[in-house]
Amino acid sequence: MAEQSDEAVKYYTLEEIQKHNHSKSTWLILHHKVYDLTKFLEEHPGGEEVLREQAGGDATENFEDVGHSTDAREMSKTFIIGELHPDDRPKLNKPPETLITTIDSSSSWWTNWVIPAISAVAVALMYRLYMAED
């Protein structure tokens, strides 16, 4: 069932997909498409455990992080059984927040340049005053 026309798309709810999280029925989501990887578990080059950890949920981020080859991406199309229901797409887990804060692209330039520049000037002046006392 590699290629599906828009008319024949089968939609699955997140609740349905989450029930298929064991070795006898292993489904996962990649880019809102639902894959039945049950028959592929033993053939997966990274081992069956990798797939089973993601079973019943969204594996998109992990799939992309690994950097799968073009061949792997083409092969994955043969396991598509449908798509995640559009109403459930917003429910997908967002990546967990980390302790590392990232600078928001909307933050102003002064927080990135002016504050460090002023700090550097202050340190330079303090050094100069300290050296002038000697």
Swiss-Prot record:
Q: What does this protein do?
A: Cytochrome b5 is a membrane-bound hemoprotein functioning as an electron carrier for several membrane-bound oxygenases.
One GO term describing the cellular component: mitochondrial outer membrane
What's this protein's name? Cytochrome b5
Give binding positions for heme.
H44, H68
Recorded disease is: Methemoglobinemia and ambiguous genitalia: An autosomal recessive disorder characterized by sex steroid deficiency but normal glucocorticoid and mineralocorticoid reserve, male undermasculinization, absent or disturbed pubertal development, decreased levels of erythrocyte cytochrome B5, and excessive amounts of methemoglobin in blood cells resulting in cyanosis and hypoxia.
Family affiliation? Belongs to the cytochrome b5 family.
Which Pfam families does the annotation name?
Cyt-b5 (PF00173)
State the PANTHER family in the record: CYTOCHROME B5
- Segments crossing the lipid bilayer: 109-131
Q: Where does this protein come from, organism-wise? A: Homo sapiens (Human)
* PTM sites of type N6-acetyllysine: K10, K19
**Residues where N-acetylalanine occurs?**
A2
In the record, what terms sit under GO molecular function? Answer: enzyme binding; heme binding; metal ion binding
| Domain Cytochrome b5 heme-binding positions | 9-85
Q: Keywords for this entry?
A: Acetylation, Cytoplasm, Disease variant, Electron transport, Endoplasmic reticulum, Heme, Iron, Membrane, Metal-binding, Microsome, Transmembrane, Transmembrane helix, Transport
